[in-house]
Regions:
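C-terminal hydrophobic helical "lid"/dimerization subdomain
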Residues: 6-9, 285-340
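Mid-domain Rossmann-like dinucleotide-binding core that forms the NAD(H)/NADP(H) cofactor-binding site
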Residues: 132-209
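Short, glycine/polar-rich helix-capping loops at beta-to-alpha or helix-loop-helix junctions
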Residues: 106-107, 187-194, 263-269
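N-terminal Rossmann-like NAD(P) cofactor-binding module of classical short-chain dehydrogenase/reductase
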Residues: 100, 159, 204, 226-227
Length: 340
């Protein structure tokens, strides 16, 4: 900060007060204002700019086991995002640096020592929403999930559920770049039209058609790769149609995130044996060390006009709960985020 008297900074934050059931409600949380303490040696103060909203955040609000521990009562709600460093006592970061990482539902953030190690500097060369979308965890998830786990080959049939979401749309487009026939599953005319704009070969509107019947018609030669963002009955429908040596990439299970009990699994997992197929889960956290590979390729494809993207930007820290719900009501159009 500039010399002279230091101005006090007020942080506005959402903390969890009770475990939600179904869609979240404002009363599940408390919006608190508090003065930010002085930073110590080795610390930085971040002014948050944009928050990323992803379906997995809803699962973090339950007490079910996951790849990260549940958000505890009276803790700030966990969320990734991008912010600007406005004060630094750490030699690795300067005032004005843009950084991405877990910053939470709040306007300001002093990361812990461990959290600061995971913060990545963001080049100030593109709009922040673009960086948070295709060059952030969304793009990295799509890239490594499809290419590293799925290993697509030209001519193969790739099915993507949640295809109009931020990750799903990226997966569809990367699969097309790799020469695959792509079938996208989404809900509603607008989202299905968006997928056609992205070059998807065939689109299934799960809200207005029978997914199992449509898959049987469209995937006449079977399914080689399924990128699963939703779980539930759609996964079961796909399993009946997989080819020998098919690869099922388990990225998310949005259909189950608002429940309080673990869902019943697919009844036809024996198809994995019959078809000698691979079903593998993965986490983008495991690939952050290789993020440069994804960013290089995605940058090249974007410059060549092969990648389309769009963002759904809400505004105001007070609207965090409503913004999260948009992912589960189908209101979001593109990558869901919030400008603070």
């Amino acid at each position: 900060m500039c010399g002279g008297a230091k101005m006090s900074v007020t942080n506005t934050k959402w903390v969890l007060k009770e475990r939600p059931e179904g869609l979240v409600k404002n009363e599940n949380f408390e919006l608190i204002k508090e003065e930010v303490r002085d930073i110590q040696d080795g610390e930085v103060l971040i002014e948050n700019q944009y928050l990323s909203f992803d379906p997995t955040q809803r699962m973090w609000l339950t007490d079910l086991p996951g790849y990260l521990p549940p958000v505890q009562i009276d803790e700030v709600v966990r969320s990734g995002g991008i912010g600007k460093i406005i004060e630094s006592k750490n030699g690795n970061f300067s005032e004005g640096d843009l950084v991405s990482g877990m910053i939470g539902w709040q306007t300001h953030h002093i990361p812990s020592e461990n959290d600061l190690k995971t913060m990545r500097k963001v080049p100030d060369v593109l709009p922040i929403p673009t960086m948070l979308n295709i060059f952030g965890s969304t793009g990295i998830t799509a890239y490594f999930g499809l290419l590293d786990v799925g290993n697509p080959q030209p001519g193969e049939t790739v099915v993507v559920s949640g295809a109009a979401g931020a990750t799903g749309a990226m997966v569809c487009q990367i699969a097309k770049i790799k020469g695959c026939h792509v079938i996208g599953i989404a809900g509603g005319d607008e989202k299905c039209s968006w997928l056609k704009e992205c070059g998807v070969d065939d689109v299934i509107d799960y809200k207005n058609s029978n997914v199992a019947e449509e898959l049987t018609k469209l995937a006449k030669d079977g399914i080689d790769i399924y990128f699963d963002n939703v779980g539930g009955p759609i996964l079961e429908s796909v399993l009946f149609l997989i080819n020998i040596n098919a690869r099922i990439i388990c990225c998310g299970s949005i259909s189950n995130y608002t429940g309080e009990q673990m869902p019943v699994g697919p009844r036809n997992l024996t198809m994995l044996i019959v078809r000698r197929a691979k079903m593998q889960g993965f986490l983008v956290l495991d690939y952050y060390g290789r993020a440069g590979e994804a960013i290089d390729d995605i940058s090249k494809w974007a410059m060549e006009g092969k990648i389309k993207h769009r963002e759904d930007i809400q505004e105001g820290i007070e609207n965090c709960p409503e913004t999260l719900n948009r992912l589960f009501t189908g209101q979001n159009q593109g990558k869901q985020m919030l400008k603070i």
